[in-house]
């Protein structure tokens, strides 16, 4: 089970949640506005604050929070130098390309929330590659230290 989780790009979870909302969520009649916006803007939590204002946590905020949690786990997973980590990086690259494709071509995905998810996928690919290179580099000893 752990091996399968290492292969699976976790940022696919919030992307799929967004896709489900964009496909099955309602939409406004305004053609200039993304149909997913009405579902993303609906409140999950409303809480009065000490300052007197009301804080709202929307569905879009929840998806972004899930994305940040998944990105954190992905960066931790990137410290592995096994071949499964390389497969995970390749899968993360496909998730990034999928997100860019959706963002550019479909109006339900032209939202700030989905753009931020796409940027999280970009950070996953970039940071994952950097962390893997650094952790692999520390495992490789370069010749100058062993002169006798």
Q: Which residues make up each language-model segment?
A:
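Membrane-helix boundary elements
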Residues: 12-56
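Structural signature of hydrophobic alpha-helical transmembrane segments
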Residues: 55-67, 88-91, 115
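C-terminal ends of transmembrane helices
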Residues: 71-83
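Alpha-helical transmembrane segments and their membrane-interface exit regions
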Residues: 119-128
């Amino acid at each position: 089970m752990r091996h399968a989780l290492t292969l699976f790009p976790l940022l696919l979870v919030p992307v799929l949640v967004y896709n489900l909302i964009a496909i099955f969520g309602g939409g406004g009649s305004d053609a200039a506005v993304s149909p997913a916006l009405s579902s993303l803007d609906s409140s999950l939590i409303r809480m009065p604050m000490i300052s007197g204002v009301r804080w709202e946590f929307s569905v879009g905020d929840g998806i972004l929070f899930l994305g940040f949690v998944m990105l954190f786990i992905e960066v931790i997973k990137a410290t592995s130098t096994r071949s499964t980590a390389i497969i995970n990086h390749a899968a993360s690259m496909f998730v990034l390309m999928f997100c860019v494709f959706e963002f550019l071509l479909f109006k339900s995905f032209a939202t700030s929330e989905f753009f931020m998810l796409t940027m999280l996928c970009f950070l996953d690919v970039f940071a994952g590659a950097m962390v893997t290179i650094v952790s692999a580099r520390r495992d490789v000893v370069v010749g100058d230290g062993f002169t006798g």
